[in-house]
Amino acid sequence: MKLLTLTKLVLSMTFLLIISINAENTIYAKFETPQVTITGNADDPAIWVNEMESNLSIVFGTDKYNGIYSYNLKGEVIGFASAGRINNLDIRTLNDTNYFFGTNTGSNTIDLWIYKNSVLTDAAKAKKFALSDNARYSKKTNFLAYGICAGITAKNEIIAFVTEAKGPRIQLWKFDNDNLKLMSTFNNDNASESEGCVFDDENMTLFVSEENARGIIRSYKLTNEFELKDMFKIDDRQRNIVGDPEGLALYKTSKNDGYLVASSQGNNTFNIYQRNYPYDFISSFVVGDSNLIDGVSDTDGIEIKNNYFNEDFPNGIIVVQDGKNTGNVIKSKENFKYISLDQLQHILDL
């Protein structure tokens, strides 16, 4: 009887803690996209920021068995690329040129699309844009390609990291002279599988999520010689991660400061860490149900931009994949949710 009472007490305290976190750190979606066409397929968002006409920015979302959707800032579809099994997508902009990197799990390739700002702006004005069905560049990874994150080095080099499904490897690619070149291959420690990653351009730091057997977020420093060094274990299941750590995103408050945000998939929360070493855990938040839009659960990909977009997103935007779109009849079909960044700023007391 005493053991049973103690167990009930512990469970009750845990429940109250969860309720407390949810009550204080709950944010809500402002818009959502339509569901993807096939069950269980939405995965990773990416955002092209229109620096000249911010309201004409474009959100992209992968439908990982079909291709890539394009959305406006209200979550409305403005195009679809039948690009195949694009699992993850990331974007970097240098001068007036935009580089869209994707991983194709059907062909096990790193794919690259390139567009000028003017092309994207004109298309956004016309409310019609899709990436081409065929990437401009495509190279075999020679392993099961899974996640991807792009970057720009201090020397203005366009790079991308590809993570391996069912293995520890990470490839570093560089785009130069109209060519995708494999620069090096590393191991994410002894990981069994990695997907989510994000590269901090200004701090030359790679963050990677390990899934499956263990749930670990690690950081690595990238040298000018394209070597990953100084591995650091930021968090794991013995601390603040439940289930798999999935999508990773940076919320930059200045050139070198800000926060790392990670999807803790097992308890439908998002963890917040300091952007810089030792990457201290700060807090967690959830995306809850509102009167119009359901909450978010089982999230894979996440993206954050702190630009002014419009009156709906005056301080920035968070876009997350919703793995259980419970507000619709077909609950197993997924979509993407848009959240105003000012809600996260309130949690962080910024």
Predicted regions and their residues:
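Bacterial N-terminal signal peptides that target proteins for export
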Residues: M1-V10
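Sequence/structural signature of beta-propeller domains
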Residues: E24-L350
